[in-house]
Amino acid sequence: MEISVASVTVSVAVVVVSWWVWRTLQWVWFKPKMLESYLRRQGLAGTPYTPLVGDLKKNFSMRAEARSKPINLTDDITPRIVPYPLQMLKTHGRTFFTWFGAIPTITIMDPEQITEVLNKVYDFQKAHTFPLGRLIATGVLSYDGDKWAKHRRIINPAFHLEKIKNMVPAFHQSCSEIVCKWDKLVSDKESSCEVDVWPGLVSMTADVISRTAFGSSCVEGQRIFELQAELAQLIIQTVRKAFIPGYSYLPTKGNRRMKAKAREIQVILRGIVNKRLRAREAGEAPNDDLLGILLESNLGQTKGNGMSTEDLMEECKLFYFVGQETTSVLLVWTMVLLSQHQDWQARAREEVKQVFGDKEPDAEGLNQLKVMTMILYEVLRLYPPIPQLSRAIHKEMELGDLTLPGGVLINLPILLVQRDTELWGNDAGEFKPDRFKDGLSKATKNQASFFPFAWGSRICIGQNFALLEAKMAMALILQRFSFELSPSYVHAPYTVFTIHPQFGAPLIMHKL
């Protein structure tokens, strides 16, 4: 009997181990090689597959090397931000594949194909390739299918244009506070001094999203922003290890720190939500800001058309993070480029004076700022908040003249496309806001050559919010100051989810 039990145990163990080995080989070798063969038969060029790691090691190595030294102001930033995709573009042409671990990733530069990918949201879905990113937020940005559609429908009213116009006084209040702080710094130094504008812009945009979306001051939400920034840095430091299967579940020191920060964010947010619920019960809270709309949806969850409490928390985390990140990077690169191009700074200031004089900017006037709109579009073209988007294919799909198998990723290289000389001309790398003087459609020839906020039905829900906030900030700054690059400024754009200035943005501010 004992021999029989032992035999069965050994047999079961052999079967389990054999199954595990087969599945591992399938994942690490057979499936990737099958997909590689499929893509090469389509005529696609790409890198040979390296088991398990793919091109991640080369990608990380080139990025680390690129970040190790700053660049000149007039240099192309693409070799510093996306060095590996840029090298592959030069080697293999405008459509090629590389390897994200064991997953082939097809990079496309053709605007028609990009439009197709971004318009077919149910076929080309979000690529969930970076599990640690979920610690910062998930929300509508990362959902697919019916859940994405439901959340988008619920959130949309908070970002209607008329609703955003009503937020302009809050924009003014938050922006005025940082401008007044800079004014005092400059006044104390006899009308000119060096100011690193980056921390101030981060604080200002954090305050705006706190006031407008959550009905609280930045003091209440400041800890959330700090924790999310710390979490983002920890994730970037861990990025190489994050692609090891199961790594995020290991009790490493880094993982414990990240999860502790994520838990603290959750606790603070729950406190903000509970505070709003108590205010609602007392009839003292708005229902039409983002948090009010989310809570209204949560109360209707039992009918099947609202959000769960967990979903609500994720949307709050997402808008705290994205609402602050997107506008702060847009503003910092606008100030850097206007410091470099004094003629455009003068034109923007003259327009602000013509529209507002010394009066407080209002929504109607902000929408009349054509020169400022051109400048912001050009900044978004040269310094998009994120350098690339990715999508996943789960079944065989036609894309242009290609037939792509399920199980591959699509990379949409925003930065490379928006600086592409074939699409934008030989001056694609130069700061020339005049290219937008006749509007976006004319500048882009109605094609997806400009998509800093994505495209189609998944276009960033907060793009109008971000642009109006940026116009308010720049109008107030231009009314009070002229500015130029400080001798201590070091040009080193790098990616921490969005494109940041690695060493800040010290400018010489002159009081007008």
Curated annotation (Swiss-Prot):
Question: Oxidoreductase as a keyword?
Answer: yes
What GO molecular function annotations does the UniProt record carry, in alphabetical order? heme binding; iron ion binding; monooxygenase activity; oxidoreductase activity, acting on paired donors, with incorporation or reduction of molecular oxygen
Supply the enzyme class, top level: oxidoreductase
* Name of the coding gene: CYP72A11
Residue ranges annotated as transmembrane are 2-22
Query: Needs which cofactor?
Result: heme
State the EC number(s).
Answer: 1.14.-.-
Note whether ATP-binding occurs among the keywords.
no
Localization, UniProt: Membrane
Q: Which UniProt keywords apply?
A: Heme, Iron, Membrane, Metal-binding, Monooxygenase, Oxidoreductase, Transmembrane, Transmembrane helix
Which PANTHER family does UniProt cross-reference here? Answer: CYTOCHROME P450 72A11-RELATED (PTHR24282:SF255), CYTOCHROME P450 FAMILY MEMBER (PTHR24282)
Q: What is this protein called?
A: Cytochrome P450 72A11
Tell me the Pfam families matching this sequence: p450 (PF00067)
Per the record, the major location class is membrane
Which Cys pairs are S-S linked? none
